Amino acid sequence: MTSSMSPAPAPAYAQVMEDMEKGKELAAQLQGLLRDSPEAGRFVDQILHTFSRAMRALDKAAVSAAGGEGSEVQSEVTCGGGASAGGKRKAPAANRKANCRRRTQQSSGNTVVVKNLDDGQAWRKYGQKEIQNSKHPKAYFRCTHKYDQMCTAQRQVQRCDDDPASYRVTYIGEHTCRDPATAPIIAAHVIHQVAAGDDDDGCGGLHAGSRLISFVAAPAAPVDAAAAPTTSTITTVTAPGPLLQPLKVEGGIGSSDQEEVLSSLTPGSSAARGGGVAGPFGPDQGDVTSSLHWSYDAVAGMEFFKNDEVVFDLDDIMGLSF
């Protein structure tokens, strides 16, 4: 009875397709006649769209009906059957193919059966799912260092149905992360300043005030006390700067013929400090205003305060009147 009724759908399908094509052509002619009416044109567009959608659906149904039997047999061979020779599967062919694809994707990882889930890696659970025809759910884990070290390793854990004490673990991807607890410790060691050395400058090749920091994985060797009698515990790195040269001033300054003055004085000083050499100075050559800001002329200031009998009033110096 089935064989006598099987050719029937072919003429019916052809008749339906012919009628749909004719209706579509008539709607197109109507669209040409109603071109000047925007409202009528919109209705005709909807009619044409409906015809086109119905024809596509009819084509898809005909292809599914023609290849349904062959698809069912191929699905039974590929995925493993469970249906009898005289019966058919209740699930659609599309669902069976999707199930086969899911099984193939799940088996792409490395699956092991273990008693203990501790594998020495850091995992974070991000989901759990009930599995069809299984007594226990499946848990999904990702590496803890997914976001800070971009590690894409994953694992799926499910308790075995036949042995509840065992777990079926599927590993997907490889660990590219590094545990911070086992990473080598980088220590910063300060090379102490050497007070005396064998170099010509007497500083062991280092400028005054310079510091060097080296980053090594091993502990630093102990510093010999004899080689470095003077050490510094300041760990701030300072760039070596120019050495300060003494300024020699010649002329009558008390009983001393020469006096060394640092050259890093304020710009408000006299030409003697800028030039480096000056003649004798008298008390009237002292810059009183600059002396209030500690930028007075060194030579004149020393000559001025040399006389113990000098008495001055602070108000007179400031030039203030109350």
Curated annotation (Swiss-Prot):
Q: Where in the cell is it found?
A: Nucleus
Give the keywords, sorted: Activator, DNA-binding, Nucleus, Plant defense, Stress response, Transcription, Transcription regulation
* One GO cellular component term noted in the UniProt record for this chain: nucleus
Record's note on what induces expression: Induced by abscisic acid in aleurone cells. Induced by salicylic acid (SA) and infection with the rice blast fungus Magnaporthe oryzae. Induced by cold stress. Down-regulated by drought stress.
Q: Which Gene3D superfamilies match?
A: WRKY domain (2.20.25.80)
Provide the phenotype resulting from gene inactivation.
Answer: Enhanced susceptibility to the bacterial blight Xanthomonas oryzae pv oryzae (Xoo) and the bacterial streak Xanthomonas oryzae pv oryzicola (Xoc).
**Tissue distribution of the protein:** Expressed in aleurone cells.
GO BP term, pick one:
defense response
Q: PROSITE patterns, from UniProt?
A: WRKY
Location of region: Disordered: 67-110, 256-284
- Grouped into one coarse class, the protein's main location is nucleus
One Pfam family, short name please?
A: WRKY
What does the further note read?
Answer: Plants overexpressing WRKY45 exhibit enhanced resistance to the rice blast fungus Magnaporthe oryzae, the bacterial blight Xanthomonas oryzae pv oryzae (Xoo), and the bacterial streak Xanthomonas oryzae pv oryzicola (Xoc). Enhanced resistance to bacterial pathogens is associated with increased accumulation of jasmonate (JA).
Question: Its biological function?
Answer: Transcriptional activator involved in defense responses against pathogens. Acts as a positive regulator of defense responses against the rice blast fungus Magnaporthe oryzae. Acts as a positive regulator of defense responses against the bacterial blight Xanthomonas oryzae pv oryzae (Xoo) and the bacterial streak Xanthomonas oryzae pv oryzicola (Xoc). Acts as a positive regulator of abscisic acid (ABA) signaling that suppresses growth of seedlings. Acts as a negative regulator of salt stress response. Acts as a negative regulator of cold stress response.
- The protein here is known as Transcription factor WRKY45-2
Organism for this UniProt entry = Oryza sativa subsp. indica (Rice)
